[in-house]
Each structure stands twice: as structure tokens, then as C-alpha cells.
Amino acid sequence: MAELTPEDIRSFSYLADIGGTEKAFSIPLIYHFLIRFLSPLVRFFFNINYSGLERIPRKGAMIVTSNHVSNLDPIFKILAVRRQVFYLAKEDHFKKQPNRFIMKSNGMIETLRSEGGRDALSRAHDVLSSGFALGIFPEGTRSRNKKPPFLQNGKTGVARLAASFPDIPIVPICIIGSREVMPPGANFIRFWKAIDIHIGVPVTFGEWLVSNDGGDFSK
């Protein structure tokens, strides 16, 4: 596999056209307590099965991606990663209390779609620059597709962030079963359902660029 030169990396970072706000990103204190409280609670109410946990980096910046079919998906991803994950979230989640308080106190990043989400991507840049884990759903919202594998077309945000940080690992996660627990439009949670969470092999944007199964820029 060919390797990218420093000049190549700078070129792709420039083309991604994402810059941070130059403000350091810190972990809200309440987030530490929430994860400790939430983990045993969720494990009590759901039968969660994990595979590939050893593939998740225990420290350093990374981008965590997955499919998105339920409002509970971010929680399941955080429990799988076993460290704080900061998400991009649509502005609707910030409009009313107590949702706004919960989102802000856990470092979630409000995405203003009227502005194309640029401010949110800049803060996401800050998360990665600070060495933290960024959670993002490539589809941009919960999928309403009713046919397996319940996917819809993705957005460009995750690709632009990955191009801005070609050496940061992207961890793919597949969540199976959360749609049965709380599908889009549902107001109630169905407890004691089985949730399967599969963690794939991490890959960096730089590795993808020169891979035969990716960008194949090595030729």
C-alpha cells in the first residue's frame, strides 16, 4: 500500500475546507457522571451484545460512525466506545427544555441546517483537534427507509472531516435492533429487546485514499 506524503495530506486538508474555531473543546463534568450512571441502567433494560470491542482505540482522536434508525443510537454507541463521545445533533433537539440542558451539558454540538451546518463542523473540528472522540451519523438523520438494511443516502460532513484529519481512525459501527426498540416517530421505548452492536475495523482517510477498495489514489 502506498503512503501519502506530507504534501498530499496538506492538499486534502485544504480541499476539505473545514477549519476549527480555535477554541479548545473540554469534557463537561456532568458527562463523566452520566456515563457511569447510564451504563448499568441501559444494560438492565436491554439485552446488548457487542462484537469487536477490541478494535476501538482507548484514547486519542477518532471519528465514530454508524447507521441511524433510533433516537437511542447515540447512547448505544457511547456504551460501546466506553469513553466520552461528542455528537453533531440537529437543532430540533435544542429547542425545548429539558432536552436543551441535556444536550448542552453533554457537549453535544448543535447543527443549524439553515447555515449548512458549517458552524457545527467547525466545532467538530475542535473536538478532533482536542484529541476527543467525535460521533457522527453519515446519513445526517434517522433513516425512514422501511426496507433492510434501512439505510438512506449519506451527507458529505463525515467525509470532509475525515479529509481534514487523514491520520485519525474512523471506527464503523453497525447497530442492529434499535429500530425495534424505538423506531422513528415512536413516543415510547420497548424494553428488554436484543441489540447487536458490531464494531468494524478502523480505517483512516489516508489509508482509504490508497486502498484498492477505496479511493485507489496510489496509481
Label each PLM-derived region with a short phrase:
Residues K77, I102, D126, V158-S164:
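Hydrophobic/aromatic ligand-binding patch that stacks against planar heteroaromatic rings
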Residues A2-R55, F76, R83, Q97-N106:
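A transmembrane-helix-recognition feature enriched in membrane-embedded lipid enzymes
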Residues A61-I63, A133-G135, P169-V171:
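Residue-level preference for the first positions of well-ordered beta-strands
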Residues P148-G215:
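A cross-family acyltransferase "interaction/gating" segment
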Residues R58-G116:
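Catalytic core of membrane glycerolipid acyltransferases/transacylases, capturing the structured
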Residues V127-A159:
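Catalytic-site beta-strand/loop segments enriched in glycine and acidic/polar residues
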Residues F46, S114-R118, L151-Q152:
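A conditional alpha-helix N-cap/helix-loop micro-motif detector
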Residues I109-R123, L128-S129:
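Helix-adjacent hinge/juxtasegments
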